[in-house]
Amino acid sequence: MKEIVSQIDAFAYNIEEGKTVRTKMKREFIFKERLNDKYMQVKFSVPNVKPGTVIEYRYKILSDFYFHINNWSAQQSIPVYYTEYDITVPEYFKFNLDMHGTEQLQTEDETVGVNLVIGGQVFQCNGRHLCFKGNKLPGLHDDNYVWCVEDYGTQVNLELGGLDFPGALYKSFTQTWENIDEALLDDSEFGGQLKI
């Protein structure tokens, strides 16, 4: 199983003599670094960056890890003028969506056609296309009363809730409150003390 990072583009925008100058990143500034025998990291360096520079970048991830979608933080430590998170998931994978934070995101949720590769075979099916967009988001700042300010930023989290393939029973990966209650009460270290 692998993830492929592709279509990396980056630009630096600077004001020079009253005009906006856009500098495109060249392919030679994209680096791959092998971390170990299983992992490789992709890095890139945006040219002509200095104080006041606006940076724009985009990339695409194609992943075999159907059970995990990376969380997305719309807010950063610096103000974000525009940010977008665009994902498509085959209809058989049921993800629970959790959005939180104080900033408003534009959200699109539509059905599209996708190709799903399983065991080398390509299947055509419907997919759920989700797109989240944020505009003019303020930067996150440290606060004396907040342990981890990033936890309070506007973000999107997706968790695999279940699999629903045709001809198979639905397989759930999430717990209901009743399941959690039962597990806690059955636990000898926790529930046993409540059954006095």
Regions found by a protein language model. Give the residues of each.
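Secretory-pathway-linked proteins and extracytosolic
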Residues: 62-67, 71, 75-196
